[in-house]
Curated annotation (Swiss-Prot):
GO cellular component, as recorded: helical viral capsid; host cell; host cell nucleus; ribonucleoprotein complex; viral nucleocapsid
Annotated gene: NP
Chain ranges for the short sequence motif Unconventional nuclear localization signal as given in the UniProt record: 1-18
Stated name of the protein: Nucleoprotein
Example GO BP: viral penetration into host nucleus
Transcription regulation listed as a keyword: no
Organism listed in the record: Influenza A virus (strain A/Swine/Hong Kong/126/1982 H3N2)
Keywords: Capsid protein, Helical capsid protein, Host nucleus, Host-virus interaction, Ribonucleoprotein, RNA-binding, Viral nucleoprotein, Viral penetration into host nucleus, Virion, Virus entry into host cell
Length: 498
């Protein structure tokens, strides 16, 4: 988030723009996704993919990963300086799936990074179009958020695996810029900071010298990003303490973990954007849609409308349920991994179930999986209604701080209560309220204790019919207040491994 006073919308962050009016924002976001679409079409031509093969989400992901790898300056430099066996630093590639005699075949392709960069720039009016690259990173991050659990990563940094709802964007690369910072959850920022502090504890030179100065600047910048996500004065004051610490150590780690726990009830503001796979934008461009002229928004009706009439396919393993695979991708498309299932189900128009009950693994297929038994099916990515994506944590009473369940970070701006187990959360706060941050800790705990699970968030906000593009008639759903829905309860998903 930029400093107060120059708050830019996500779209501006996403397109690297300075302050623009709504029409200019819509046009520049449109230009960004249009560029992605043009690039995708060109890549399909290069690879001689049929329209059918081009609609396969696995092919889309391979192509997206190739362009991200082609523009990864730091990794490219590293690869050139540390040549490893069997890795050509100048090439990038991945699995492409083709339809042959009624079966899907895997083919590993290899391309010059330079060539990929040329195609990308050509599709983006000769520019590097970093915003489009970030957009693809956020789509991959949203897919990871819906697919994997981060229990191991949480435990490694001393956090509680039940804090998974704070982990949005935990797999985003460092280079994802302001748009990336906006979508990172409180837990993700805390984890990045704890890793940094731990390195400082173990490595005496981490904060020293010319490099240490740069490290320090990065540390303070990350602290400010996290501070900007908190909505209460006490949480922000604690972040100032962490940032200004002369020599960050265990006290800072304690404070950060305390703050992460507090965010389960006093929620942070985390942005949500619907970032779709490149093939979806490609389909639209190919059908003659002019994104720049029509304008586009990541937080309004546009992504819903795009998904209403695009057919995306996915490979399906023998014992996977295609409907479950569709739910996974739908959640990823709308950045709804941490949303209340009651809200997601209402918007989608079909029941969205917790991940522990899904019979599906990740979207990507490992190179050792047998293609003989692979089938494909059309993903059902349509919705019954649409709703505006939110950037607030849904805190009530003057939108300051309020209730939250262990495990929800609202995506849609739709009225609901945010049920939570206060006993479970408060149990984590026994004991330590001494030290420099004692008064802030006491204040935070007091606010958490006064939060009521029955309070309504997003008062008066509703969903809209897909024909209601100007959002004139909100339909405010009524939810069963007792039956909260978290995607992560009873979870048995795979861990995310880089």
């Amino acid at each position: 988030m930029a400093s107060q006073g120059t708050k830019r919308s996500y779209e501006q962050m996403e397109t690297g723009g300075e302050r623009q009016n709504a029409t200019e924002i819509r046009a520049s976001v449109g230009r960004m996704v249009g560029g992605i679409g043009r690039f995708y079409i060109q890549m399909c031509t290069e690879l001689k993919l049929s329209d059918y093969e081009g609609r396969l989400i696995q092919n889309s992901i391979t192509i997206e990963r190739m362009v991200l790898s082609a523009f990864d300056e730091r990794r490219n430099k590293y690869l050139e300086e540390h040549p490893s066996a069997g890795k050509d630093p100048k090439k990038t590639g991945g699995p492409i799936y083709r339809r042959r005699d009624g079966k899907w075949m895997r083919e590993l392709i290899l391309y010059d990074k330079e060539e990929i960069r040329r195609i990308w720039r050509q599709a983006n009016n000769g520019e590097d179009a970093t915003a489009g690259l970030t957009h693809l990173m956020i789509w991959h991050s949203n897919l990871n958020d819906a697919t994997y659990q981060r229990t191991r990563a949480l435990v490694r940094t001393g956090m509680d695996p039940r804090m998974c709802s704070l982990m949005q964007g935990s797999t985003l690369p460092r280079r994802s810029g302001a748009a990336g910072a906006a979508v990172k959850g409180v837990g993700t920022m805390v984890m990045e900071l704890i890793r940094m502090v731990k390195r400082g504890i173990n490595d005496r030179n981490f904060w020293r010298g010319e490099n240490g100065r740069r490290t320090r600047i990065a540390y303070e910048r990350m602290c400010n990003i996290l501070k900007g996500k908190f909505q209460t004065a006490a949480q922000r004051a604690m972040m100032d303490q962490v940032r200004e610490s002369r020599n960050p150590g265990n006290a800072e780690i304690e404070d950060l973990i305390f703050l992460a726990r507090s965010a389960l009830i006093l929620r942070g503001s985390v942005a949500h954007k619907s970032c779709l796979p490149a093939c979806v934008y490609g389909l639209a461009v190919a059908s003659g849609y002019d994104f720049e002229r029509e304008g586009y928004s990541l937080v309004g009706i546009d992504p819903f409308r795009l998904l209403q009439n695009s057919q995306v396919l996915s490979l399906i393993r023998p014992n996977e349920n295609p409907a479950h695979k569709s739910q996974l991708v739908w959640m990823a498309c709308h950045s709804a991994a941490f949303e209340d299932l009651r809200v997601s189900s209402f918007i989608r128009g079909t029941r969205v179930i917790p991940r522990g009950q899904l019979s599906t693994r990740g979207v990507q297929i490992a190179s050792n999986e047998n293609m003989e038994t692979m089938d494909s099916s059309t993903l059902e990515l349509r919705s019954r209604y649409w709703a505006i994506r939110t950037r607030s944590g849904g805190n009530t009473n003057q939108q300051r701080a309020s209730a939250g369940q262990i495990s929800v970070q609202p995506t849609f701006s739709v009225q609901r209560n945010l049920p939570f187990e206060r006993a479970t959360i408060m149990a984590a706060f026994t004991g330590n309220t001494e030290g420099r941050t004692s008064d802030m800790r006491t204040e935070i705990i007091r606010m958490m204790e006064s939060a009521r699970p029955e309070d309504v968030s997003f008062q008066g906000r509703g969903v809209f019919e897909l024909s209601d593009e100007k959002a004139t008639n909100p339909i405010v759903p009524s939810f069963d207040m007792s039956n909260e829905g978290s995607y992560f309860f009873g979870d048995n998903a795979e861990e995310y491994d880089n």
